[in-house]
Amino acid sequence: FVRMTYDDAILKYGIDKPDMRLPAMVNFSSELTPELREALKIEQNLPVLGFLIPNVGELSGTQRKALISQVRSFLGESGLDALDTTRLKSSSQFAPLEDAISQKFLLEYSSFLGFASPAEEDEHLVIVITPKLGTPAKWNFDSQWIYKRVGALRLELAKKFADKHKRFEQTGTEADYKFLWVTDFPMYEWDEEAKVWNAAHHPFTSPHEEDIKAGRLTSDKGAVRALAYDVVLNGTELGSGSIRIHRQDVQAEIFRSLGMSDEEAHERFGFFLDALEYGTPPHGGIALGLDRIVMILAGASSLREVIAFPKTAKAIDLMVDAPTPVSDQQLKELSLRTVVRN
């Protein structure tokens, strides 16, 4: 299987479970000079990203206008905007930028899609997204936010034009299945509301030895990589796992890095810390989602189609008509009581 780090997955696909049946995103930041950014009202230090949906065919002016409107609606108040590259050609100031964008798409995608000239490129839908001046400060605490947003748009348009590019159709060949391992997930994630770092996976996942030695557990939590991994197929996570911490000193340091005192750690996990003192071999594993694997094998589009007693969107089991009211006697037997919220 292909192997890709979490950071590469986000920077290239905008998601931690890439669907590699479609080409990756392209970063056009180096093509936009400060002068061009100023003229186009684009933030100076934020990435400009583009992607291509293959074999959509040439769109009419009306169709393209409607598509740009749909893209802007999807982006909402994010501060991101669609750059209409077709209008750049008519301006002597921006025509070189349009040519640079076209050439970079050609360079990045020619081997993937099999076209070798800009004329063939016209059959493919090109989308370029720019951060407008004053893009929300959310960027300040999530440096990957723009990549994730553009990645979500990429998938949305891929679904919209699925009947055109046909990349999601089953051909009965090995090419239908794009497996990969995504590795090196973040050890911590930032909670903006609580202003604290939390364990992204769980606090028993082992961090990279290099990050431990560099002191990043206390000095730079956002850069700490976990020995965590997912196996992905066609944009679906089939399983997730990690290498566990097997050293007491590392486990204690992780608890401290999450704001837990040594006393609290021993009160809650003393049994585990004591066990680690006697020596534990390196160990890890993975949990596979059997229901998702069955869904793919069955060619189903939803987990509900392969689960024996699926729930509705309102969490109702239509087979047994659950949930149903519980009698007072049943509640009493279980020492439970119901509380009605105002």
Give the predicted meaning of each segment.
Residues 1-342:
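Class II aminoacyl-tRNA synthetase catalytic cores and aaRS-like
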